[in-house]
Amino acid sequence: MNVLCDRHHDGLFYSLQLLFENRLGGTVYTPIGHDWWDAGYWRFGEQYGDDRLARQFLDAGPFEYGVAYDPHHPERPIHGITLDEARALPWEYVVATAQDNQTGFKKFADEVGAKFVLAVGNRSQFIDWNLDPLALISSEVDIWARGVRVHQEFDQRTFGYRDPDEATPVIRSFINCFGGMPCERLQRAMVPMLPEFTFGIHGIDGQDGNIETVSEIAALMARSAFGYHDKEHGDGFGHVIHNWASIGRPLIGHRMHYEGLMAEGLWQDGVTCIDLANRSLEDSAAMIRDIWADKPRYRAMCEAIRAEFEKIDYDAEAEQIRSLLEGSLVAA
């Protein structure tokens, strides 16, 4: 079973590899080469009026056919395929993840006799239901036709629960471009209130550097006392926030940013997180200090957020997806 899937977000693409390869027994390929853009199939970034994202994601280089490895998951091969090569293969599914690619990928699916799948992981992502996709929704977006709401899977061995005794007095963030967000000002204001803690700000543009591999991220999370995850616009699915929960480290941030979103259940003030909206910044800092000093209380919070994560049943969701793909799940 061959599956064609665009790749614009490494966590989402990896989750689709786990689904279509590990669970469903197929092989996932991703487009490579500018021909995909020239032929009108790949349109991600066309709103910029040029092909900058096509050159970033499609140009030959790191994703040569059959030999590339994901820099974030270096053990996982990425099978790149040119347009000419793709036209010569049989396809079961053609999967678009970028909003701009849905029309072109639907066209390619029709041409090769494949089923068209749309995997949605971003907030407020537009779905053209007139294309009649089989929709895998891992955000708050409404489902109006054939689709299921699921959580994006990630490697449970890498992000397995880690004993709270491994944690050190470090508060870390892995939010990309955090410095440009309004919530970052609160984080900076909190730093002098907690001199006994070290703060690590990672991710793209992070002052402490971007961490490339997920294994390194998991190791740093395990050695952290808390995950600082405060994003005014929340997340579609939210790989980082679910990684924190899987490893078992309490969150710091605003619950209100996640109301109605996939990660809402991870925000329970005093149980799984410190909700900055419920008290002053000074009182929040004092609460963080008190929780860290009270090891049984801290352990209980680590266990509580892990227990909340364990409510996700990836096996059951995979069977829902299988039913959707095979046609036994009716439209919403």
Predicted segments — roles?
Residues 219-236, 249:
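Acidic donor-binding loop of glycosyltransferase active sites
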Residues 5-9, 33, 95-101, 119-123, ...:
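Structural motif
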Residues 1-107, 111-112, 276, 314-332:
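N-terminal pre-catalytic "stem/leader" segment of glycosyltransferase-like enzymes
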Residues 279-282, 292-329:
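A charged, aromatic-enriched C-terminal amphipathic alpha-helix characteristic of glycosyltransferases
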Residues 117-162:
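Donor nucleotide-sugar binding/catalytic pocket of nucleotide-sugar-dependent glycosyltransferases
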Residues 152-217, 240:
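Conserved catalytic-core segment of nucleotide-activated headgroup transferases in glycan assembly
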Residues 229-242, 253-265:
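Nucleotide-sugar-dependent
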